[in-house]
Amino acid sequence: MEGPGADGRGMTGARKARRSIALSLLYALSCVVAAVVLVISGFSYFVVKDVDSIGSSHAIVSGPSIGPQNILLMGLESRRDWAGNILPNYILKALHAGNAQAVANGAGGNDTNTLILIHIFAGGKKAVGFSIPRDDWVNFAGTLGPQQVGKIDQAYGVSLYYEEQKLKGQDPGLSQDQLAFQGNEAGRAAAVATVEQLTGVHIDHFAEVNLDGFYELARVLGGVEVCLNHPTSDVNSGANFPAGYQHLDPQQALAFVRQRDGLPNGDLDRTHRQQAFLDAVMQQLRTDGTLNDLTKVQALLSVARQYLITDAGWNLLNFASQMRTLTSANLVFRTLPIQGYETIDGQDANAVDPSAIQSIVHATFYPATRSAAPASVVGPGAKQPSPPVVIPSTGPQGGPVTAKNGIPCVN
């Protein structure tokens, strides 16, 4: 396996109420994981029998599924599936991620390339999400092994690796499935704890999807429409796009959300692309009749059943029932700020101020108590938060504010 820190349901949606649930939840839950959670939550409210088919995890103690809650969405960039099997060659090719032999020899990692923290306000009528840049340099929390600091996206892979090494030493006869299951559980616990420590808020639920799940989602949707401010080309991700409004097939969509090299703001621009991808999916579901097409709905739900993992205590039916009143006007995206760029241990990283981040997150999630310090900071030695700073503007950022058909242009 790779070393540490390497860099389902069915029903038509004919009624407007059902369509509104799905679209609103999609936008609120954001990016790759969000698209899958949306479909599950929106339709599972009407199709009770299919809820238990979603993969579940006991990595955290779940919070409530009704009322105010914090949800972490994780997109895992791994060349392996949940059982530890190497991804099919057609997906590796689409990812520009080498081949099966390279993965078997240790290529790739288990980084959380997408981390989005969502707060659902009481009553479910309002939601706000913070994208967490993957290169933020942080202290880890809940990780196994000697590495206790690094980029925030590495916390998952570090714990996964050392958990598997520990288990191999204890019982050399464990199967690949058993190692992968326990390793991923350790990774999830570490990723959640590290985000809690950085942001100072408790996470009630999480949802996780892998690269193969993203690819299959884009395939079922038939690709997405996006808009770029400038032409771009990157051999590492396979991105090669002209400027302007354009349709991306599934392979191109993967390159679009994975590119970081050659972008003016690197990983921050990639974060904005992930947000733009969400907008594109939302627009597509709104306009092309996907949610009224039983065949497409069943295909989307099949992707959810196969590729989505949520915490075992998240009652998606209760969650969906609360989200019925959410409108797109009450859904906002923001990106956690950075202080600048640094090279640490040979890695390009974002310098961050946890105290300032905690103040921003607390003031946004709990505005009625914004003068108070965050009460749920995780981890020893957490610093007293600085006074709140200006919150970044909403929506995908990083370029001229232009759009076509509701889809913003990004770098």
Residue ranges and their predicted role:
Residues E2-N411:
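Non-catalytic, solvent-exposed segments at the cell envelope interface
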